[in-house]
Amino acid sequence: MALNFSLIPANTKLEANGDGETIDISSSESRTFFCRLTISDQIEQESLDVSVWGSASGQDFGKRPLLKIPQQFYRGTTKMVLDVSLRSEVKFLRAKWELNRWGRVAPTPMFVAELELDEVPPMSRETPTRRAVLAGKA
């Protein structure tokens, strides 16, 4: 069964830099995830940087993220694919976010966001490719 989880739960109010909960992905078959960052509210003159980090132990997440989502300024949804199929040591994922605010008023940044991951199902080896279908017609 495909995994579906949130690294940043829906309607989370982000007002300071932080880390999300650690999620165990060791039961994932494909180890490939469709990521959706949705920003539902924000104020002007601020930015949000979100990244996804991996760990073998659930404790040490290293010095470099597995995925950096492009910097966000406005409401909307950004979609990306995270593929850790070649990183067999990665058993846990966690989101990290950094907020930046500039301007003259209210120095506290604020975003309401969600980062949801859906496992991409593994492709069946029995599914014929287009090339195989065309070769069979020749």
Residue ranges and their predicted role:
Residues 41-46, 105:
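A short beta-turn/strand-edge loop motif at beta-sheet boundaries
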Residues 21-25, 76-86:
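Exposed aromatic-hydrophobic patches
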Residues 30-37, 86-113, 118:
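Noncatalytic modules at the cell exterior or secretory-pathway interfaces
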Residues 1-30:
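Transition segment at domain starts
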Residues 49-53:
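Beta-strand signatures of extracellular beta-sandwich domains
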Residues 2-4, 8-13, 102-138:
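C-terminal interaction-tip segments
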Residues 10, 63-74:
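Solvent-exposed serine/threonine-rich low-complexity stretches and specific carbohydrate-binding patches
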